[in-house]
Design a protein with these regions (language model features):
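N-terminal loops that bind phosphate or other acidic moieties
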Residues: 1-372
């Protein structure tokens, strides 16, 4: 994996931004999350008053477990989804258009051939990752290719002038790889993020099944905090090799590269969340550059895992719209929250600008000014 350097947030810009926010014509702290988002972007961009951000969307396509017993569709559902992106008819693309956000759709590893889809960026490494019950999800060489490609896309989107990128995925059977990646990094027990399904094996049977596969690969880490920086990186890369898959590996590198360019990243589901966890474990400073977005209404699989991912990261999703389609829709809608925070920061007037009185008591006293 290539080397990179991520810098901390620029504190003087954040302090100046916070002072302006506290002096906007509203009760102090009343816009809550919008305020903290704007303040963080000031630190990311080293600008006390960021505005007119340039947005983008990156959708990565890859199937999982193609040689596993659950593969009955053989990529047909994924192909249908990617075909809609090729035609430009998805909800994600509609939402992105409202923010003038360019949408990149990259095929890393769908099981079916997409060479005939002219609007899909063809970067196929292999046609789907393995079932780790058979062999590691991807080879070491495939892992390196996915990582380098992720960094290359971060370089490319930065060169295009983007400042915030919403990430998402298209692909079948990503649940198991996301589950194992999440549990290994957060240290939670499988029973805490598996939900009973009356139509299949019990939770206990599923846990035993997973352990029978993953235990032989030695991916468990007793205490991540006890590892050195290089040991953490190597442990994460081994995890991605065994149970990550092409999309999670690519997105991990993209997130690291984006943060090194001071680009923010918005994530949504368990696949993008797993990549965030991997990137944050490799370099904890990544956490300052990532933002949650939506909760998907999928209580059996996605919801418990995503909840654990957000708990570990110390964040809460902003949007609760009972969405069933992911495909970067949640993260793209998350861009609208960031856009709203920029409008708050730049379009609202301060007490001085509006020539109105400030708070005479309470939290705003002494913090708000009505004259120079």
């Amino acid at each position: 994996m290539r080397t990179f350097k991520i810098e901390p947030l620029h504190v003087p810009s954040m302090e100046a931004c916070r002072l302006r926010i506290d002096n906007l014509t509203k009760p102090i702290y009343s816009l809550a999350t919008l305020e903290s988002i704007a303040e963080r972007f000031a630190g990311i961009l080293r600008n006390p008053k960021p505005n007119h951000l340039r947005y983008g969307v990156l959708v990565v396509a890859a199937d999982h477990l193609v040689d596993g017993p659950q593969n009955t569709e053989h990529g047909s559902e994924s192909y249908d989804a990617i075909e809609r992106f090729n035609e430009g008819t998805t909800a994600t693309q509609g939402a992105a258009a409202k923010l003038n956000a360019v949408v990149h759709v990259v095929n890393l590893g769908l099981e079916q051939d997409t060479a005939d889809l002219a609007n899909i960026e063809q970067q196929v490494i292999r046609k789907g990752s393995h079932f780790f019950g058979v062999e590691p999800a991807i080879s070491r060489e495939e892992l390196e290719r996915a990582l380098e490609l992720g960094f290359a896309y971060a370089d490319r989107l930065h060169a295009d002038g983007l400042q915030v990128v919403a990430i998402g995925n298209v692909g079948e059977r990503a649940f198991l790889d996301s589950l194992v990646t999440t549990a290994t990094i957060t240290g939670c027990a499988y029973e805490d993020i598996l939900v009973h399904n009356e139509y299949g094996p019990t939770v206990e049977q599923r846990i035993a099944h997973i352990h029978s596969f993953v235990d032989r690969f030695n991916i468990d880490v007793d205490d991540w905090s006890a590892l050195s920086e290089s040991e953490r990186r190597d442990a994460v890369l081994n995890l991605l090799h065994v149970a990550g898959g092409l999309d999670i590996a690519f997105l991990t590198a993209f997130i690291l590269g984006a943060a090194s360019h001071r680009m923010a990243v918005v994530f949504d589901n368990v696949v993008t969340g797993a990549a965030i966890l991997a990137a944050v474990t490799i370099d904890p400073l990544v956490k300052d550059y990532v933002f949650p977005s939506a909760v998907y209404d999928e209580p059996i699989h996605d919801e418990p895992i995503h909840k654990e991912q957000c708990r570990f990261l110390g964040v809460k999703p902003y949007l609760h719209y009972s969405l069933l389609i992911d495909e970067a829709l949640g993260s793209t809608m998350g861009l609208s929250i960031i856009d709203a925070s920029m409008h708050m920061l730049n379009d609202m007037k301060t007490f001085i600008e509006a020539e109105v009185s400030v708070a005479e008591d309470g939290a705003g006293k002494g913090r708000q000014k009505d004259k120079e």
